[in-house]
Regions:
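Conserved Rossmann-fold cofactor-binding substructure of NAD(P)-dependent oxidoreductases
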Residues: 55-73, 80, 84-88
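Short beta-strand element of Class I
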Residues: 26-29
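Aromatic pocket-lining residues of Rossmann-like dinucleotide-binding sites
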Residues: 19
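Conserved N-terminal Rossmann-fold NAD(P)-binding element of oxidoreductases
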Residues: 3-9
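N-terminal Rossmann-fold NAD(P) dinucleotide-binding loop
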Residues: 12-15
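Helix N-cap at the beta1-alpha1 junction of Rossmann-like dinucleotide-binding domains, i.e.
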Residues: 33-37
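Hydrophobic/aromatic anchor residues within beta-strands of the central parallel beta-sheet
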Residues: 51-53
Length: 131
């Protein structure tokens, strides 16, 4: 298993610390828009060749797909703000890799009758694409 963790904040850094104690994966790439956050997350696993870092714009599907392909990633863990769920999900779908997250796409109200009809509910788009 080759994992891309998108987001090197609190959740991504915690995922690195937990994964470092395990042997279920071959490699983990920790990626964030801010290289300093990547360095901070990787500081706890210095010398472990199973970890590497990269810079990524989580709003750019093409750059996420390129990173997935460059590192032979098989699974992506989304550890960023929910606003970036859909670009990361779309990149995984395009690249044909598994997507893991602690959330789903944000709900949106009905465009014409927000108080009368349901709009797009949490996760609707992902479930629709998966069927």
């Amino acid at each position: 298993m080759r994992i891309l963790i998108v987001g090197a904040g609190g959740v991504g850094t915690a995922a690195v610390a937990i994964a470092a104690r395990r042997d279920f994966f071959e490699h983990i790439v920790v990626a964030d828009y801010d290289p300093a956050r990547v360095e901070h997350a990787l500081a706890q696993v210095t010398g472990d060749p199973r970890f590497s870092g990269a810079r990524v714009d989580a709003s750019d599907v093409a750059s996420i797909v390129a990173l997935i392909r460059e590192h032979g990633v098989t699974h992506v863990l989304n550890a960023v703000d929910p606003r970036f769920v859909m670009p990361i999900f779309d990149a995984c779908y395009e690249a044909g890799v598994d997507y893991m997250d602690m959330a789903m796409s944000l709900s949106r109200p009905h465009p014409d009758k927000p108080f009368e009809l349901p709009g797009e509910k949490l996760g609707d788009r992902q479930f629709e694409m998966a069927s």
